Amino acid sequence: MDKRKIKVAILSMSSLLMISMTASAVLADIQRYFVGVDPSLISMVLTIPSLMGLVFAFASGPLSLHLPKKSLVIFGLVCGLTGGMVALLFGSLSIYVLLGCSLLLGVAQGMNSTMSMALIADYFVAEESGALMGLQSAFVNGGSMVLLFSSGMLAGVSWQLSYLVYLVFIPVIVIVMKNLPNDHPQTADQERPAEKSAKLNARVYFTALIMFLFGVFLFVFQTNVAMYVAAKGFGDASTSGLINTSMSAAGMLTGVLFGRMQRVLRQLIIPVSLVVGSLGMLSIFVIGNLPALFIGAMCCGFCLATINPAGTFVAANAVHASISSLAIAVVTASCSVGIFVSPLLSNAVANAAGGNLAVKFLWATLGLFGTAVLAVIGNAILDKKGIGGQKS
């Protein structure tokens, strides 16, 4: 077993995990194209992948106990390629075609977000596992940066052309087929008593709650940045693409440094990350100019690139190794639920404030800061009770 080849496969598939975010730069263009369509329906082009991501992120954990992870990964990648190509060729026919494509993208997002972390937990241990989770986050954001920039430039010609970036699924499928080994799930009679009795604990469920709240509040940025740029007259889809690219660039750098930050901050890494995200949202609400959007994007990128590997690492190390995939699936699915309901809640807040778009960023500021406080208090209680402590 060549671990270097496994790393190549994991990191290549990870580089596509945020490809559905390319829609964030063209939401305003899609809204102008489909005249009279409810804005909430337009936002679902971006949020439906999170809904399907929820279903398949959770389902992939139990499925991996019965099917090879390699097969699940390839299935997800093929769904992503299919969704992107259908959107490219037929997305202009109806908003519902785009929504259907978003469902397929969600399958890819949910399946492989869980599998990428589960594969790391399977083949790598202790500090090597944590460092690789950070590197995985760097590739998620690095890939996102390139994809967002490319799709933003293509969207400057036509929003439909932004879906050309989904062709990148083809080489990744080849890399995974060549480098990822076929694992063979254990049968019931192969399981040891400790594995059969293994259960999820309060640490996993609390981390899932934090990830849910994180998804609710941080995703305010992705679903509203293009609308905010258009409303303020700061530019077009290309401008939104550059802002999203800066978010991914900050996330990529953060992912590379994640291993070191985790060793220094330990359990404070999640609260600190949430506070940084809160400050980014606050800069958009208080200052509200184009530089503030870039600052906010970089703060959100730091938050995103830190929370995902940190939350996954906590969940995987809080339970018996035999159910680490299930723990990761629960945490990943919780984040997807938060992302899906985010525009519904933020739109309700904005409507209550008279349709003020900027108030969404204030709501996100308060929410992220409150979640940071909750994380500190909750983990202190769990530590005191000795529940789900991280394994060395």
Please state what every model-predicted region is.
Residues 24, 203-247:
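Extracytoplasmic gate region of multi-pass secondary transporters
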Residues 55-94:
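Conserved MFS/SLC helix-loop-helix module at the cytosolic interface between two early adjacent transmembrane helices
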Residues 101-139:
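Cytoplasmic helix-loop-helix junction between adjacent transmembrane helices
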Residues 135-181:
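Helix-loop-helix hairpin linking two adjacent transmembrane segments in secondary transporters
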Residues 316-355:
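A late C-terminal transmembrane helix in Major Facilitator Superfamily
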